[in-house]
Curated annotation (Swiss-Prot):
Processing and modification events after translation: Phosphorylated on serine residues by cAMP-dependent protein kinase A (PKA) which is essential for activation of its cation channel activity.
Glycosylation: residue positions: 641, 652, 674, 690
Transmembrane domains' residue ranges: 199-219, 265-285, 332-352, 374-394, 424-444, 553-573, 605-625, 704-724
Regulation acting on activity, per entry: Cation channel activity is activated via phosphorylation on serine residues by cAMP-dependent protein kinase A (PKA).
Coiled coil: none
Cytoplasmic compartment residues: 1-198, 286-331, 395-423, 574-604, 725-782
GO biological process, one term: calcium activated phosphatidylcholine scrambling
The organism's place on the tree of life at top rank: Eukaryota
Additional note from the record: The term 'anoctamin' was coined because these channels are anion selective and have eight (OCT) transmembrane segments. There is some dissatisfaction in the field with the Ano nomenclature because it is not certain that all the members of this family are anion channels or have the 8-transmembrane topology.
UniProt name for this protein: Anoctamin-9
Chief localisation class: membrane
Location of Phosphoserine modifications: 250
Region (Disordered): 756-782
Gene: ANO9
């Protein structure tokens, strides 16, 4: 009853007074600790912005916040801290997540430690949700120039600078608990996840490297490469309008050898391995997360309850927003999202147009290299254009996703963040992978055949695959995009904040004014750091999700993707640490017990990876045609001679025949006088050039393989998920033990209240309550 009475006194307002100011048991801290600062430009007293500024600050004072004003030459700094009464209310609201036992007095509660992270989190929430009498929020005032910035202060970061945020500590274990104490659980979980992801990339990277190196054994020994290199008598039909000449198949010898570095039988094994790897990675991560949040006392922490408590601290008259669902709003959002996806697909078509036009442009170029290597130049420049498109569309996608979230009107900040994550990732996925989907599954399949080619606007012939297939194009596209994202993005991610910080510091030092007040110097130093926002950590997660997509989706075409990701992540961990500690203002510490919606994103990518890799092996690589030839048309079946290579004659078998007289303008092709036949990659029969029986048989086998591959891979994923429990037994046992001890404690207090009848001795509590005190309590220390 005493706990309920104290909660009533703290929450219920009396008349016009604010309840926090009525708490006499909480005294102001003796030592002033300013952890949060607002910054504004100096205004004259007649400036209307000055009055609006004072109204906002007065509202904060009324809610129990202390404000210290320090004026500099151009700025005014407002140090803000909460009265102890605010933390008293916080303790009471979150004293026991499950509520007190009926008819039982609770033991004296363990005091929730008022850490710097907790103070910052409460102050930040109230500042962001505080409203003046005119209904203006801090964001409204910032837009009108009333305030310039808000940020928590860096304090006590010296140890993190020495032990974590340095390049020489790249291979050291991260001080996760110190990161959590300084930046909060959300940032700490990001680094825990990133560290675990990097660690798990080691076996994937080594396996991918082994598969790639095994291709070198086929560099000279491959029967297919030998036949291509020795095919001096086979003339290939012109691939496009830029190449109006016949080409000997042997001229593509080097290209064919390079293709077989990664288009070999090991690709299938590696694709299945990566499907299993993705599942094991996620399952073991869930176990790792369970151990970490148990250690942090957050196993039963409820984000929604925490946000409601902060809302009540900010405004005792806060009205709960119930869950609502509007089918009309959901339909509008779905339609708008689909329109954006169609735009992404349209961007892929723009890239197709570019590649077609670039082929025509390079073929008439005055540069000999471009004229001779048209296909290579088109592939490389196309990848660069796609990378630039990604940078531009990322900004557009963010704005669209934000507008969709505003229209959807989510209840809470966490719900808004979750929905924004889904919208933004969906748009980013199509932005990054649209060109890869085109190359993998469309390129060379809709271009018709020699003599009757599909043309863009009736003028330009669509590009075709190389004589060795489209796998090389897909490999180059992935290598360039992923390589640029890992190298350029990391360079920009570090250099831009570093240069910006240096420029801000130089401009401040040129003024020649150095404050004497050490507190003002500290606040000014924090002000000169690079600003952060809600998306700072979100952007880091998004970058890693896209990288994870490149590492798993289409990995059959690029087995070196895990190796590139491993090297990139080793740099990324320290790069993010240096940014957060040295170059940026302090992030607002936020609590979390998992990585949220990102886990669903990872699981979705895992499923898409199985489907995409199955289709790449079936439709893009030459694996299925090779297997069908080996067991249906191979000379091994006819001669019964084991010494004969079963792929002998495969190249000739996979090329269709075209009569040069069927060209619309055969005389316009260089060297056509003595050529009656040319070959091209397809399964068609002259004279009508319709698809042959082999084509339909291969198509059936390809579809059957996709279904079989997906079912086998998904079954392996399900078995792995079942075999590896999400929560370790040790965690379950600790949780069970604490539940039992807690019930015994309540039983003892209940018997004491009833007069001591059969009360017995007080049950012993766990000797080491750190990880096992998760239910005692409070789950609020940071």
């Amino acid at each position: 009853m005493q706990g309920e009475e104290s909660l009533r006194i703290l929450v219920e307002p009396e008349g016009d007074s604010f309840p926090l100011m009525e708490i006499s048991t909480c005294e102001t801290e003796a030592s002033e600790q300013w952890d949060y600062v607002l910054v504004a430009q100096r205004h004259t007293q007649r400036d209307p912005r000055q009055a609006r500024q004072q109204q906002f600050l007065e509202e904060l004072r009324r809610k129990g916040f202390h404000i210290k004003v320090i004026r500099d030459q151009k700025q005014v700094f407002f140090g803000i801290r909460a009265d102890n009464s605010v933390f008293g209310l916080y303790r009471t609201l979150l004293l026991e997540p499950e509520g007190p036992a009926p008819h039982a007095e609770l033991a004296a509660p363990t005091t929730i430690p008022v850490t710097t992270s907790l103070r910052i989190r409460i102050v930040n929430f109230v500042v962001m949700n505080n409203k003046t009498s005119a209904g203006e929020t801090f964001e409204d005032l910032m837009k009108d120039g009333v305030f310039e910035a808000r940020f928590p202060l860096h304090k006590g970061e010296g140890r993190l600078k020495k032990t974590w945020a340095r390049w020489r500590h790249m291979f050291r274990e991260q001080p996760v608990d110190e990161i959590r104490n300084y930046f909060g659980e959300k940032v700490a979980l990001y680094f825990v996840w990133l560290g675990w992801y990097t660690y798990m990339l080691v076996p994937a990277a080594l396996t991918g490297l082994l598969v790639f190196l095994s291709g070198f054994s086929l560099f000279e020994a491959s029967q297919i490469s030998k036949e291509i290199c020795e095919a001096h008598d086979i003339l290939m039909c012109p691939l496009g309008d830029h190449s109006r000449r016949y080409q000997r198949l042997s001229e593509t010898c080097t290209f064919a050898k390079l293709t077989h570095l990664f288009d070999n039988d090991g690709t299938v094994v590696f694709a299945i391995f990566m499907a299993l790897w993705a599942t094991v990675f996620l399952e073991i991560w869930k176990r790792q997360r369970a151990r970490v949040v148990l250690h942090w006392d957050l196993y039963v922490w409820d984000e929604e309850q925490e946000e409601m408590a902060l809302q009540l601290i900010n405004c005792p008259d806060y009205k709960l927003r119930p869950y609502q669902h509007s089918y009309l709003r959901s339909t509008v959002i779905l339609v708008l999202t689909l329109l954006m996806i169609c735009l992404m697909i349209g961007m892929a078509h723009v890239l197709v147009v570019y590649r077609v036009l670039a082929s025509a442009l390079f073929s008439s170029s005055a540069v000999p290299f471009l004229e001779e290597q048209v296909t290579t130049a088109v592939v490389v420049t196309g990848a660069l254009v796609h990378y630039v498109t990604i940078i531009i569309m990322t900004k557009i996608n963010r704005c669209v996703a934000l507008k969709l979230c505003d229209f959807e009107m989510p209840r809470t900040f966490s719900e808004r963040e979750s929905r924004f994550t889904i919208r933004f990732f969906t748009l980013q996925f199509f932005t990054h992978f649209s060109s890869l989907i085109y190359i993998a599954f469309i390129l060379g399949r809709i271009n018709g055949h020699p003599g009757k080619s599909t043309r863009l606007a009736g003028l330009w012939k669509l590009e075709e695959c190389h004589a060795s297939g489209c796998m090389m194009d897909l490999f180059v596209q992935m290598a360039i995009i992923m390589g640029l994202k890992q190298t350029l993005s990391n360079c920009v991610e570090y250099l831009v904040p570093w240069v910006t910080h240096k420029c801000r510091s130089l401009r401040a030092s040129e003024s020649g004014h150095l404050p004497r007040d050490p507190e003002l110097r500290d606040w000014r130093r924090n002000y000169l750091l690079n600003p952060v926002n809600t998306f700072s950590l979100f952007d880091e997660f998004m970058e890693m999700m896209i990288q994870y997509g490149f590492t798993t989706i289409f990995v059959a075409a690029f087995p070196l993707a895990p190796l590139l990701a491993l090297f990139s992540n080793l740099v990324e961990i320290r790069l993010d640490a240096i940014k957060m500690v040295w170059l940026q203002r302090r992030l607002v510490p936020r609590k979390a017990k998992d990585i949220g919606t990102w886990l669903q994103v990872l699981e979705t990518i895992g499923v898409l990876a199985v489907i995409a890799n199955g289709m790449v092996i079936a439709f893009t690589s030459e694996f299925i045609p090779r297997v069908v030839y080996k067991y249906r048309y191979s000379p091994c079946l006819k001669e019964g001679n084991s010494t004969v290579d079963c792929l002998k004659g495969y190249v000739n078998h996979s090329l269709s025949v075209f009569h040069t007289k069927d060209f619309q303008d055969p005389d316009g092709i260089e060297g056509s006088e003595n050529v009656t036949l040319c070959r091209y990659r397809d399964y068609r029969n002259p004279p009508d050039y319709n698809f042959s029986e082999q084509f339909w048989f291969l198509l059936a086998i390809r579809l059957a393989f996709v279904i079989l591959f997906e079912h086998v891979a998904l079954c392996i994923k399900l078995i792995a998920a079942w075999f590896v429990p999400d929560i370790p037994q040790s965690v379950k046992n600790k949780v069970l033990e604490v539940k039992y001890q807690r019930l015994r404690e309540k039983m003892w207090h209940g018997r004491q209240r009833l007069g001591g009848v059969g009360a017995g001795s007080r049950p012993p509590m766990p000797a080491h309550p750190t990880p096992a005190s998760i239910f005692s309590a409070r789950s609020t220390d940071v």
